[in-house]
């Protein structure tokens, strides 16, 4: 299965479909497990790149069976996706930079493990992103407008690792959080912090009943309740009801 690496800057890519099926537990040609960051279908590290009407998918399967499997790995600056579809399960979309250090030795094995952690900004408009566990993750500043986030299994939409000194992490405005077939009510969360200063803000979004009444999860990191930056403004739908976790700032 070919992987696509896009390194050219200042380009527009339209009407393309990229499909792959590599996964973290797969044995790499070098004899080691492939790992998360070598499982991508597409890696784009060019700057000022726009994708329009493109499809990115990783069909390896559920995370419980294959581990992480990236459809799209972004590590350029000022990348925009318009009217695109992303499909996967665990870790569908990675938005660089990586955190400074891995928790598990070798956890960042891949094309960017030793590169400088540069601040990145990404924009998504009118996109559909499907996944299960932590399916949008990373340390970037990313804006999602009029997008649909489809939870295809129980899990978490966002897993931010926003650096402490970066004010804005992931922002979703006028988006829809919906459930795939057979996803139970209350079985999914908007976000959980991959690192202690993770930042997510959702604004005027529709939340289906699969979103748990707590809204956000702390990933067992009670020490991070005072450092995470989870903000919710003007949510609608069944998933907007109930008492939010006490580390979430809700603005009516």
Show where each model-derived region lies.
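Sequence-level preference for short, compositionally simple segments enriched
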Residues: 1-252
């Amino acid at each position: 299965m070919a992987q696509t690496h896009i390194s050219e800057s200042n380009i527009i890519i339209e009407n393309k479909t990229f499909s792959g099926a590599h996964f973290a537990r797969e044995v790499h040609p070098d004899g080691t497990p492939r790992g998360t960051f070598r499982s991508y279908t597409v890696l784009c590290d060019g700057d000022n790149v726009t994708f329009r009407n493109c499809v990115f998918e990783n069909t390896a399967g559920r995370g419980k069976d294959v581990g992480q499997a990236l459809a799209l790995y972004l590590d350029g600056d000022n990348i925009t996706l318009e009217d695109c579809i992303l499909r996967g399960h665990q870790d569908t979309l990675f938005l660089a930079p990586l955190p400074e250090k891995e928790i598990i030795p070798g956890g960042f094995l891949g094309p960017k493990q030793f590169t400088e952690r540069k601040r990145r900004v990404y924009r998504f408009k009118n996109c559909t992103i499907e996944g299960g566990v932590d399916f949008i993750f990373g340390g970037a500043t990313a804006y999602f407008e009029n997008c649909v986030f489809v939870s295809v299994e129980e899990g978490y939409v966002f897993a931010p690792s926003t650096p402490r000194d970066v004010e804005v992490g992931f922002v979703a405005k006028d988006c829809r959080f919906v459930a795939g077939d057979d996803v139970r009510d209350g079985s999914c969360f908007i976000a959980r912090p991959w690192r202690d200063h993770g930042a997510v803000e959702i604004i005027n979004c529709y939340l289906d009943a699969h979103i748990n009444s707590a809204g956000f999860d702390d990933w067992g990191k009670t020490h991070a309740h005072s450092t995470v930056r989870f903000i919710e403004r003007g949510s609608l739908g069944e998933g907007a009801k109930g008492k939010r976790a006490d580390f979430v700032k809700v603005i009516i």
